[in-house]
Amino acid sequence: MRIALGISYSGSAYEGWQSQLSGKTVQDKLELALSRFAVQPIRVMCAGRTDAGVHALMQVVHFDTPLQRETSSWVRGTNAFLPSDIAVQWAQPVPDEFHSRASAIARRYAYVVLESPVRPSVEAGRVGWVYRPLDGDAMRQAALHLMGEHDFSSFRAAQCQAKSPVKTMSRIEISQRAGPGSRYWRFEFEANAFLHHMIRNIMGCLLAIGQGNHPPEWLAEVVAARRRDAAAPTFSPDGLYFLGPVYEERHGLPSRTAAYDWLP
């Protein structure tokens, strides 16, 4: 049978999602925990690979197993073997044709950025940081140039393995919440798929515009250039969260977890 799991994790201590020889990745820790609980080797496929330092609120994976166990057993049993910064949120049987990556019709990410004269301490790794004030209207105006279908080569990492740089951005929302002497900014992105470092490179551009280094129209020029050197430097992975994939309702999978509610 095929099982889907919803996984949340803090990426700060890991070398990204994808398995490596070092064993210091989220995939390695999850597969080890699943294999120990199932007492047999288990390999998983994920909805979207995350970089080192990037967090996930609802990564979705699937795996095949001959074992018949209650979904609650997969959750509690696997969590018993996972480190404290990785947790299975839910488990659900799915049809054999379901694929965590191929069945996803969209993917969602959020960036949380602290605007403050002082760098974060307690929130280190959980938020990005800028010390110069940001202009929300300018960033929202600039973001309009990213909506719809575009060739996103200007935001593509050199090591990106995607077959095509053409993606469709369906949603960008920028909001803020004020605190004493600071502001938390939340940037949400939804697209059919993302290129390697695409969001981090877009964030570098949006923040440059928000800080007054470029006008909003500059982002349209960056898109049109289709060259990585036309864009701003890649922003830090701190504060980047994979919110999860979007599936058709017929799959009946959860669309969010409680962890969404504590993001600024």
Swiss-Prot record:
Formation of pseudouridine at positions 38, 39 and 40 in the anticodon stem and loop of transfer RNAs. SUPFAM superfamilies: Pseudouridine synthase. It comes from the Bacteria. Keywords: Isomerase, tRNA processing. Substrate binds at Y109. It comes from Polaromonas naphthalenivorans (strain CJ2). Homodimer. PANTHER family: PSEUDOURIDYLATE SYNTHASE (PTHR11142), TRNA PSEUDOURIDINE SYNTHASE-LIKE 1 (PTHR11142:SF0). Belongs to the tRNA pseudouridine synthase TruA family. GO terms for molecular function: RNA binding; tRNA pseudouridine(38-40) synthase activity. This is tRNA pseudouridine synthase A. Its EC number is 5.4.99.12. The active site is at D51. One of its GO terms (biological process) is tRNA pseudouridine synthesis. Gene3D superfamilies: Pseudouridine synthase I, catalytic domain, C-terminal subdomain, Pseudouridine synthase I, catalytic domain, N-terminal subdomain. It catalyses: uridine(38/39/40) in tRNA = pseudouridine(38/39/40) in tRNA.
